[in-house]
Amino acid sequence: MSEAAETLDGWYSLHLFYAVDWTTFRLIAEDDREAMITELETFIKDKTVARESHQGDHAIYNITGQKADLLLWFLRPEMKELNQIENEFNKLRIADYLIPTYSYVSVIELSNYLAGKSDEDPYENPHVKARLYPELPHSEYICFYPMDKRRNETYNWYMLPIEDRKTLMYNHGMIGRKYAGKIKQFITGSVGFDDYEWGVTLFSNDVLQFKKIVYEMRFDETTARYGEFGSFYIGHILNIEDFKQFFSI
């Protein structure tokens, strides 16, 4: 039996994707639309308390293309807090005009593939803590996609010896390090939580960097032989002060 990699787990994660029902929304009186937007602004402002107290974070982006219009990403210490946030959001008046298109449930994850041996408690390491319980960047662009490690008769990631997997992940990670300062990456584990095994969320002020890193990694053995991917979502940041313009008709 192949040895399982150990993981460090941080905040729980919920990506929510919505399309706006513009046809119905435009039928609402302007005063009512403005009241809905104000209610949404209040909801988001209330969630900044978690960021300020370092008990979670969130990000909101306008998705490009027809897969969705909005992405709301929330991080919290407990899964039930994500349920509470989603339930609260669904009860907003404006939610009546938002059509759910996709969601992803996971948890911020670090694996031990690249970790050295140490007696130190990794959860007390400042660098590790910053990655498990992050403050999300306010980058111009976001990219999200789910992925699996392939497991079939020809290529099965889970049957490889752990030392082979460590070597492959080391080489894979070296490509990612070339994009340090250009891309901020967050890996969330979702085995047993959602339909794929991991979610990958990338932030950058240069949207072209997403294409560059994903393309370059296609030639890495870890991806070429063992990577399987879901849909890609690209978006531009949507700040609270942008809500009125975004929802204006």
Swiss-Prot record:
UniProt keyword list: Heme, Heme biosynthesis, Iron, Metal-binding, Oxidoreductase
Cofactor entry: Fe-coproporphyrin III
SUPFAM superfamilies: Dimeric alpha+beta barrel
Name assigned to this protein: Coproheme decarboxylase
Family matches, as InterPro entries: CHDC (IPR031332), ChdC/CLD (IPR010644), Dimeric_a/b-barrel (IPR011008)
Entry similarity comment: Belongs to the ChdC family. Type 1 subfamily.
Keyword Nuclease: no
Pathway membership: Porphyrin-containing compound metabolism; protoheme biosynthesis
Details of cofactor binding: Fe-coproporphyrin III acts both as a substrate and a redox cofactor.
Catalytic activity as recorded in UniProt: Fe-coproporphyrin III + 2 H2O2 + 2 H(+) = heme b + 2 CO2 + 4 H2O; Fe-coproporphyrin III + H2O2 + H(+) = harderoheme III + CO2 + 2 H2O; harderoheme III + H2O2 + H(+) = heme b + CO2 + 2 H2O
GO molecular function terms noted in the UniProt entry: heme binding; metal ion binding; oxidoreductase activity, acting on the CH-CH group of donors, oxygen as acceptor; peroxidase activity
GO biological process, one term: heme B biosynthetic process
Binding-site residues for Fe-coproporphyrin III, renumbered to this chain: R131, Y145, P146, M147, D148, K149, H172, Q185
Annotated transmembrane regions: none
Functional summary from the UniProt entry: Involved in coproporphyrin-dependent heme b biosynthesis. Catalyzes the decarboxylation of Fe-coproporphyrin III (coproheme) to heme b (protoheme IX), the last step of the pathway. The reaction occurs in a stepwise manner with a three-propionate intermediate.
Organism, as annotated: Staphylococcus epidermidis (strain ATCC 12228 / FDA PCI 1200)
